[in-house]
Amino acid sequence: MDADSDVALDIIITNVVCVFRTRCHLNLRKIALEGLNVIYKREVGKVLMKLRKPRITATIWSSGKIICTGATSEEEAKVGARRLARSLQKLGFQVKFTEFKVVNVLAVCTMPFEIRLAEFTKQNRPHASYEPELHPAVCYRIKSLRTTLQIFSTGSITVTGPDVKSVATAIEQIYPFVFESRKAIL
């Protein structure tokens, strides 16, 4: 087994965060009283609204800014955001679905081997930091892709990035480095 051979790695997207604007002022009290699956947080000036399909939680501010979390793909995030905008229109607001943007993607990938973290950190010092007293994973940053990887000794890698493409590219880039530091199978 060598690092150049094509290995099929499953990248499981666990969370997609997106933002959009409604281009109108939203009355949070009206949303709280008339909306479905709503929690009104008056002390912080926001409303939480949950959708069942797709399973999304939205944070709504009176300015019209809405953040949606919980989707498992970029398409699902957009469908959920549009569905949320439609439910606000049904409450009587003049909502226009604008400035939609995926801001964060969280994914998990499991390598088919375990990783020696101390050795990996020494070989990749400027990009990797490992503090075993504080956290059991190596934090590896790829500035060009704006991604952060948490690499665990079990071979599990958690990737945070701006979009799905950069997350997949980060996994492709990191594979040869973690392959060099893999634990020998007895």
From Swiss-Prot:
It comes from the Eukaryota. Keywords: Cytoplasm, Developmental protein, DNA-binding, Nucleus, Transcription, Transcription regulation. It holds the Pfam family TBP. GO terms for cellular component: cytoplasm; nucleus. One of its GO terms (molecular function) is DNA binding. It is found in: Cytoplasm; Nucleus. GO terms for biological process: DNA-templated transcription initiation; embryo development ending in birth or egg hatching; transcription by RNA polymerase II. Its main location: cytoplasm. InterPro entries: TBP (IPR000814), TBP-like (IPR015445), TBP_dom_sf (IPR012295). PANTHER family: TATA-BOX BINDING PROTEIN. Belongs to the TBP family. Part of a specialized transcription system that mediates the transcription of most ribosomal proteins through the 5'-TCT-3' motif which is a core promoter element at these genes. Seems to also mediate the transcription of NF1. Does not bind the TATA box. Members of the TBP family are differentially required to regulate transcription and development during early embryogenesis. Particularly regulates genes that have a role in catabolism. This is TATA box-binding protein-like 1. It comes from Xenopus tropicalis (Western clawed frog). The gene is tbpl1.
